[in-house]
Amino acid sequence: MPLIPYALTRPFLFGLDAEHAHELTLASIARLQNTPLQCLWQQPRIDDPVTLAGVRFPNRIGLAAGLDKNGRCIDGFGAMGFGFIEVGTVTPKGQPGNPKPRIFRLPQAEALINRLGFNNDGLDAFLANVRRAGFRQGGGVLGLNIGKNAATPIEDAVDDYLLGLEGVYPHADYVTVNISSPNTQNLRSLQSDAALDALLGRLQERRQQLIARHGRSVPMFVKIAPDLDEAQVDVIAATLKKNAVDGVIATNTTLSRDAVRGQAHATEVGGLSGRPVFEASNRVVGQLRAALGAGYPIIGVGGVMSGADARAKRDVGADVVQIYTGLIYRGPALVSEAARALKG
């Protein structure tokens, strides 16, 4: 158990502006990771190994991308017991993201709305942080999530993804291609049939070159949205298989507000995460499993607020599970709770 129960620190954090609390938490973890004070949140990693896409995951619970966009706190989050950690989304050039305020809590629904817009320090700073981290050397799996700059026209998006893939490839256990954030204009259009096929074709061509150059095969995952109908999911699944993509992450945040109507901040623009996205995410995971068949790697994410939620996501077809908003509402104890629920 962490030395300081999260129930004692959450009221203080929730009394702050949501983004300020987020930045304060990251700054504290970055400062204290790999020091004796890491014991404040440290807990043992549950041992439950599973191999996906040729990568051995020490357990089935991971941190979703977006919480640590610049990879500043990899070892600190690793100390919470995660088997795998995904950092980013990183873009080739640093960018400030959308104007503040841009993160909103909906406590009644155990949810967040964000319209951050891929705010990050850029690829060079990101890779410097990744190189400093010892998480991989300790057996953890590190996923690096890449996206496009807001200033890059959508028709040139592939160039940004190629730059990202080139940069992160030597340092990643897997690479995630993020085409599903609702906060970068037109990004989700890359999920459409022809656009996705063209993007993945170019990325796989470059990946084969990188395999030859580095002498190792780093699997590539694609992260998709929950706001897709069954026909769209089937098209995406077929396109993933056609382009020999190693796995899929389902899902990102939702644009739907059906579950939070009438609540404070419910009308804010951005992606909704947390408990309200759980069912939509599980629906997409289940549809992907049916379309892709047994054995195709699926990382499930969206609305996991308890160990039972994590198990339910595995039961509908996810091989491993990620959390983000649940960590904000429940704290580090959720990591071990979910890992135990997913075991076996």
Swiss-Prot record:
Keyword Magnesium: no
Family annotation (PROSITE patterns): DHODEHASE_1
One Gene Ontology term of the molecular function aspect: dihydroorotate dehydrogenase (quinone) activity
Named cofactor requirement(s): FMN
Reaction equations catalysed: (S)-dihydroorotate + a quinone = orotate + a quinol
Residues bound to substrate: 69, 114-118, 178, 183, 252-253
Primary location group: membrane
Cited InterPro entries: Aldolase_TIM, DHO_dehydrogenase, Dihydroorotate_DH_1_2, Dihydroorotate_DH_2, Dihydroorotate_DH_cat, Dihydroorotate_DH_CS
Entry keyword set: Cell membrane, Flavoprotein, FMN, Membrane, Oxidoreductase, Pyrimidine biosynthesis
Pathway involvement of the protein, from the record: Pyrimidine metabolism; UMP biosynthesis via de novo pathway; orotate from (S)-dihydroorotate (quinone route): step 1/1
UniProt KW Flavoprotein keyword: yes
Cofactor binding comment, as recorded: Binds 1 FMN per subunit.
EC numbers, comma separated: 1.3.5.2
Pfam families: DHO_dh
Gene Ontology CC annotation, any one: cytoplasm
GO biological process: 'de novo' pyrimidine nucleobase biosynthetic process; 'de novo' UMP biosynthetic process
Protein residues bound to FMN: 65-69, 89, 145, 178, 223, 251, 274, 303, 324-325
Active site: 181 (nucleophile)
Cell location: Cell membrane
UniProt topology in membrane: Peripheral membrane protein
Protein family per UniProt: Belongs to the dihydroorotate dehydrogenase family. Type 2 subfamily.
Complex formation: Monomer.
Functional note: Catalyzes the conversion of dihydroorotate to orotate with quinone as electron acceptor.
Protein's name in the database: Dihydroorotate dehydrogenase (quinone)
Organism: Methylibium petroleiphilum (strain ATCC BAA-1232 / LMG 22953 / PM1)
